[in-house]
Structure formats: structure tokens, C-alpha cells
Amino acid sequence: MNEDGFREVLGAAEGMREDKTSWVSFFQWLLGRGLDGVKLIVGDKCMGMLEAVGEVFPDTKYQRCTVHFYRNVFSVVPKSKVKIVAKMLKAIHAQESKKASREKAKAVVAELRAMKLKEAAKKVEDGIEETLTYCDFPGEHWTRIRTNNVIERLNREIRRRTRVVGTFPDGNSALMLVCARLRHVAGTQWGCKKYMNMKRLEAALDDVSGAG
């Protein structure tokens, strides 16, 4: 998301692994191309990325994608109870403040333990805080920034195109195709329609600066 509230593709890299070194290299490449003012990074529970964020963007906040968080909890829940647990988890993120969400999370943890779902309770207890970072931002942005759904259209498009081709002679040819599709999607409504009103964020940041 750029400063004007439009979605923007910052870059793509070939053969990147999920370790810290790869993420640090990618982030530093983006910085070298002029990236600055990063306020929030949203992602799944990738330790390599988390460690890299702390090193390259020490002042940037991290939001764990709530959808990935739910899936992680569901992995230790019987299929027969997934629907009810899903409602419980969504109730946490339906609260109107971080304090209320924390209190709701405590209640959910207690309820999960009462349901004999100790592993699920532990996952919620241990991981809920990093899913609540979005509460530090303007309320109207919450549904936009608590998941990484913003890139799902890109991922679907990339998978669709690469499956058609099947195999590539080398990594560079694959990267060229991916970048071509990213440029195409960026030129559609995905990138041309305003996604967020950034004036609220600017005002909130000004208030914080003034208070400091």
C-alpha cells in the first residue's frame, strides 16, 4: 500500500527461500530501490521473515494474518468442531478495541480448555497478541490490514499462468513471466482503484508525534 492508498507491487525475486538471509536480502533490495516509511508488514508465521523484519525494519510493526492464524489453530481441532471454534476466533477480532479483543481471547482460551482442546487453547494464548497489531491503526483500516488477502489476487494469477506453462527452462524465464503478470494485474482495478483512505493514518501519526 503506497502513501496515497493504492495497492502497489514493490518487487519480485527468483528462487527466494523462507530463511532470514533470503528475506534480509530481499528487503534490502527494496530499500535500495527507494522503499521507505514502512509502517506495517502483514504476513504469516514465517520465522525467517519475522527475524528479517526486526533487523531491516526495526521501527515497523508486524501483523500476523488472522486467516493463517485461524488455520494454524484449526490444525489441532477435530473437524467436527472447526465451525464452532471459527466463530469463537472471529469473535476475538470483532471487538472494538485491542483491550476488548484481549479480554475476549482470554475467555476463548478458557472455553477451549473446557472443550478439552488444550492444544488449540495454547496456540490462541501464545499467538493472539501478534494478530492484534491492526488495532493500533485507524478503525476503518482494520479489515484491510489484519490479513494478507490483498496479495491473494496476485498469487492466484501467478499460479494460473505458471500452471499453463508447466515447466520453465530456467529461473529467469519463470521470473519474467511472473513479472509480466504482476505488471498486468497492477494495471487493472487491483492497482488503479483506491484501497484505503490514508488521511486517517496520517492524522493518527501526527497525533502520536504531537503527544511525544
Q: Where does each model-flagged region fall?
A:
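Acidic/histidine-rich catalytic cores and adjacent linkers
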Residues: A91-G212
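A generic short alpha-helical patch detector that favors 3-5-residue windows
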Residues: G15-D19, I41, Y62-C65, V77-K81, ...
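Conserved beta-strand -> loop -> alpha-helix junction used to position metal-binding or nucleic-acid-contacting
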Residues: L40-M47, A52-M88
